[in-house]
Regions:
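Intrinsically disordered, low-complexity Pro/Gly/Ser/Thr-rich segments with frequent PxxP/GP/PP motifs
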Residues: 74-104
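Short beta-strand elements of extracellular/lumenal beta-sandwich folds
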Residues: 30-58
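OB-fold and OB-like beta-barrel modules that bind single-stranded nucleic acids
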Residues: 47-49, 97-98, 111-115
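Short acidic/polar inter-strand loop motif in beta-rich domains
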Residues: 105, 117-124
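Short glycine/proline/serine/threonine-rich loop/turn segments at secondary-structure transition edges
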Residues: 103-112
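Short acidic, flexible loop segments centered on an aromatic residue
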Residues: 56-75, 112-116
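Acidic, serine/threonine- and proline-rich intrinsically disordered appendage/tail regions
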Residues: 2-9, 17-31, 39, 123-169
Length: 169
């Protein structure tokens, strides 16, 4: 009987303590990825922004801004560099993709994007964070890329035409 009483007390204590938990505020993990293998002048570059809410409440009024790509060096082909997402529920994610086209070749420093959000419905002040930083990347000239990766059809046709006389004899 004494063991039965101890088990009942432990169960009542466990039930009483689990009901008092507060929901943790929203906390966003933010990453920025460049999806292209080669960065080429005049060709599209795909950039993916991923947000994941690891908190216990929804993140509200999420604003993503990336000031890395100036209009003098890059043209925005698809998507937007400044985006607002109304809410990201707890345990879920949101992604955004931007397609840009570089107008110059050379080395370029891809810096972090910025996110700001309200961690709960009652928060008065927005939290500000930064994404992961892809770092420095080389944008190669289109001529160099074309020289390496073009199918060289004209070269193969001229080779075939020059080797035909020796095969016919």
């Amino acid at each position: 009987m004494d063991n039965w009483l101890k088990i009942c007390i432990v169960v009542v204590f466990a039930v009483a303590t689990t009901g008092n938990e507060e929901a943790t505020p929203a906390k966003l993990l933010f990453s920025k990825q460049i999806l292209n293998k080669y960065l080429v002048e005049g060709m599209d570059i795909v950039i993916k922004y991923s947000l994941f809410n690891v908190g216990g409440t929804a993140a509200l009024d999420v604003q993503v801004a990336d000031n890395t790509f100036g209009p003098q060096d890059f043209e925005v082909v698809g998507g937007q560099l400044k985006v607002t997402i109304d809410r990201i529920p707890p345990g879920s994610n949101a992604t955004h993709v931007v397609v840009i086209r570089p107008s110059k070749y050379g080395y370029f420093n891809f810096t972090a994007a910025e996110v700001s959000y309200l961690p709960s419905e009652y928060a008065a002040e927005a939290l500000v964070g930064l994404s992961s930083e892809p770092g420095q990347g080389a944008i190669v000239p289109f001529k160099e890329y074309d020289r390496k990766f073009s199918p060289h059809l004209l070269d193969w046709l001229s080779f075939a035409a020059m080797s035909m006389p020796s095969l016919v004899l």
